[in-house]
Curated annotation (Swiss-Prot):
Pfam families: malic, Malic_M. GO terms for cellular component: cytosol; mitochondrion. This is NAD-dependent malic enzyme. The modification Phosphoserine is found at S445. A divalent metal cation binds at E248, D249, D272. Its EC number is 1.1.1.38. SUPFAM superfamilies: Aminoacid dehydrogenase-like, N-terminal domain, NAD(P)-binding Rossmann-fold domains. GO terms for molecular function: malate dehydrogenase (decarboxylating) (NAD+) activity; metal ion binding; NAD binding; oxaloacetate decarboxylase activity. The keyword Oxidoreductase applies. The active site is at Y103 (proton donor), K177 (proton acceptor). It comes from the Eukaryota.
Length: 565
């Protein structure tokens, strides 16, 4: 990762080619000398502006769009392929306002309408009809030399942002996640590659759309799918051997098995499984600082046992194991509820591979009449200290369920983290009322504070952007051999223990994304230290803590214009 300094850089372009390069274009900020040298003096208005003047103009243009999120998304996307420095400078100054525009929820609309509103190519498109290792390597080599790419986000678009199978349009989720890597943690955007794997789509709306730009066939599965993915991973390892691989928004049937398959051998990560789990764990750790009770003594019930729910469960288990529990005892503290109720051994035939380690013995619940055990009954039986919602089913955390839980726990920890807000299992004000103001609450979407006994109570957001960018940058900086459970736990612990000055309020369980860069530095530092202690780092990092912190900052990419030579 190049140092974020003011050094001069060599510009290989000139004329209109330079002005059309988002990497090198400065628009009206080119100096008179640069305009002359690079043959663009007649192509720009005579005034020379600062980056801040450009940011101010763009923000005025952005506000003039009005209350049309998708149009704002398109405006910012156009800016990103015109002048990336200006794009990142603008958003970094309005981060909280613009993240919902460039990421969830608005990016979901852009993805759904990808083929209808397509304007310019972004990212790398690999399709299963060209499942040949040599050809895939040739495609990847179009994006640079072996050291040109250090971070890759790859999706097959089956599980996009809660909106499901989006086919080729899923490339935009890889693009958006990369933007957050740069904004929140300083990843060099010129060394990041977003990839979409087009393996067909089962989305009939897209396949029937005459504008659709992807493969018009059923989503491929089985051996052909696995062969294609394996060739893609092999090609990445050969063309960009030092690149860290980030799997994003794969479907329930593939996400965990793919991660389990590749994780022992290559440096890789799945944000939906590990990132979501690590952020939820950080929020739990934050809540446990309030209750002053250890993670290893918690009884945790997860409502919704899909990719996110299982990912959170596995991350909590890993955290408990790191804190000293055996694997079996840690899993014994997790209780999963899915469409068939509390998951028991009798559900083994219909349980996914990810759910099976959490099946409880039927004999442990023999006093329950035959039939499925619903949430309210399960709470009465298990008496959980923590309740997490990942189901996408609004209203499922009922008053009866919350009051039952509050009977057994002095400060119940309740996180309805399904996105968007319309799919939350309960609203924070309902949880607050039904728990008599005792619950510690976090959500998956940004929400205003509660009024609790005349005081403002901040609702923390379990936002993956708080963690995955820093985790990814730490993996890049260390060129880690693998991403270990210890490194993930270090990230969760670091997020939960950043300086309180970075929190929106004293009672907040997680820090404020407004302070993304400072939060990320704290996490990067902790993960690097853990990587070194486990022998996972292949880079000789500074051993002095103060020097390591300086080293991290020096390697951040920042949106600033540098002199050209």
């Amino acid at each position: 990762m190049p140092a974020g300094t003011k050094e001069q850089i060599e510009c290989p372009l000139k004329g209109v080619t330079l002005l059309n390069s988002p990497r090198y274009n400065k628009d009206t900020a080119f100096t008179p000398e640069e305009r002359q040298k690079f043959e663009i003096s007649s192509r720009l208005p005579p005034i020379v502006e600062t980056l801040q003047q450009q940011v101010d103009r763009c923000y005025d243009q952005y506000k003039a769009i009005g209350d049309e999120p998708l149009q704002k998304n398109l405006y910012l996307s156009q800016l990103s392929v015109t002048n990336q420095t200006l794009f990142y400078a603008l958003i970094s100054q309005h981060l909280i306002e613009m993240i919902p525009i460039i990421y969830t929820p608005t990016e979901g609309d852009a993805i759904k309408q990808f083929s209808d509103i397509y304007r310019y190519p972004e990212g790398c498109y690999l399709d299963i009809d060209h499942n040949d290792l040599s050809y895939i390597k040739q495609q990847l080599s179009e994006f640079g030399k072996s050291d040109s790419v250090e971070y890759i986000i790859i999706t097959d678009s089956e599980g996009i942002l809660g909106i499901g199978d989006q086919g080729v349009g899923g490339v935009l989720i890889s693009v958006a996640k990369g933007h957050l890597m740069t904004l929140c943690a300083g990843l060099d955007p010129n060394r990041f590659l977003p990839i979409v794997l087009d393996v067909g789509t089962n989305n009939e709306t897209h396949r029937k759309n005459h504008q659709y730009m992807g493969l018009r066939k059923d989503r491929v599965r089985g051996e052909q799918y696995d062969s294609f993915l394996d060739n893609v991973i092999k090609a990445i390892r050969e063309v960009f051997p030092e690149a860290f691989i980030h799997f994003e928004d794969f479907g329930l049937a593939n996400a965990k098995r793919i991660l389990d398959h590749y994780r022992p051998d290559i440096a890789c990560f799945n944000d939906d499984i590990q990132g979501t789990g690590a952020v939820a764990l950080a929020a739990i750790i934050g809540a446990l600082h309030v209750t002053k009770s250890p993670l290893t003594e918690q009884r945790i019930m997860i409502f919704g046992a899909g990719t996110a729910g299982v990912g959170i469960a596995n991350q909590i288990v890993a955290g408990m194991v790191t804190d000293g529990l055996s694997l079996d005892k840690a899993r014994g503290n997790l209780f999963m509820i899915d469409r068939c109720g509390l998951l028991l051994e009798r559900h083994a035939k219909i349980a996914t591979d990810g759910q099976k380690p959490f099946l409880k013995k039927d004999s442990d619940f023999k006093e329950v009449p035959s039939g499925d055990i619903n949430l309210e009954s399960a709470i009465a039986l298990v008496k959980p200290t923590i309740l997490l919602g990942c189901s996408g089913q609004p209203g499922k955390f009922t008053e009866k369920a919350i009051r039952e839980m509050s009977k057994h726990v002095e400060r119940p920890i309740i996180f309805p983290i399904s996105n968007p807000t319309t799919l939350m299992e309960a609203k924070p004000d309902q949880i607050d009322k039904w728990s008599d103001g005792k619950a510690l609450i976090a959500t998956g979407s940004p929400l205003p504070p509660l009024n609790r006994n005349g005081k403002k109570y901040v609702i923390s957001q379990c936002n993956n952007a708080l963690l995955y960018p820093a985790l990814g940058v730490a993996c890049v900086l260390s060129r880690c051999k693998l991403l270990s459970d210890g490194m993930l736990k270090a990230a969760s612990d670091a997020l939960a223990t950043v300086p309180r000055s970075l929190f929106a309020a004293d009672e907040a369980l997680l820090p404020d994304l407004n302070n993304a860069r400072e939060i990320s530095r704290h996490i990067v530092f902790a993960v690097l230290k853990q990587a070194v202690s486990e022998g996972m780092s292949t880079v000789d990092l500074p051993k002095d803590d103060a020097k390591l912190k300086e080293w991290i900052i020096e390697r951040e990419w920042n949106p600033e214009y540098k002199p050209f030579v």
